[in-house]
Amino acid sequence: MEFIPLLSLGLVSGLLGGMLGIGGGVVIVPALIVLYELSARHTSADVTVIAVATSMACIVFTSFSAAYTQFRAGKVKFELVAKLVPFFVLGSFLAGLSTPYFDAGLLRALIGLFLLLVAAVMLLNWRPNASRAFPGVIGSSLTGLSGGYVSGMAGIAGGNVIVPTLVYFNVPMHNATASSSTMGVPIALAGAAGYAFGAPMVSGVSGEWMLGLIDLQSWLGITAGAIIAAPLGVKIAHRVPGDILKRVFGGFLLLVALRMLYSSLSL
């Protein structure tokens, strides 16, 4: 596969991630699926799961800058991170181990539905009402395991899951965003490890530049582009109204989600 399209994808995902504060996975996964299908680099049955696995590996490195920035700003609620991150990490790792067993069409449909939900949230600018106290051990474990599993299955770092959850449990938005960014690194690392170790369970996935289910060639290009573009995205976000950006991207994501759902019918 040519390096330029991968670098371009990294630039776009980093730019949008910096502008909108979203996980790059919502851009990387559908774009990689299209690139893999056009290049015939992987078989059609493996395209979706490889795109998800590679996305998780990309997010490990691209989320470092966001986590560091939030740490320096002093907005991270470490007591919340300590309660949730072990369960999110476990859920993401389990997703990496089990998702390769999913039927290709089912996996793509599930990701399409998730993207459809994210698009709706952006278009409607929806935020949950802060109405409950933070849960105890059982509630934290169930929340973390389920949220981590969805994050790992969809190839995202968890921000689209973590932030609404924390706000729902009465955590201020800026603290929820900061804590989510901090949790993104271990969640993505756990998911990527699961996909790397889970690869031997999937027949027919092998070749050069492959670490389990992670396409290292794609990872290199996307990561390089995202690291370059993310700081620029943050600067743009300070000059352009965030609500407008989210609605525009939400409309684009709606089209992507519908395409994902349609293409899942042919797998």
Predicted regions and their residues:
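Selective transmembrane alpha-helices of multi-pass membrane proteins
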Residues: 88-93, 104-124, 214-231, 242-265
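Helix-loop junctions at the membrane-solvent interface of multi-pass transporters
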Residues: 19, 72, 101-102, 124-125, ...
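Hydrophobic alpha-helical transmembrane segments in multi-pass integral membrane proteins
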Residues: 94-98, 149-157, 191-196, 256-267
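Small-residue-mediated transmembrane helix hinge/kink sites in multi-pass secondary transporters
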Residues: 70, 92-100, 230, 234-238
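Transmembrane helix exit motif
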Residues: 60-73, 113-135, 235, 257-267
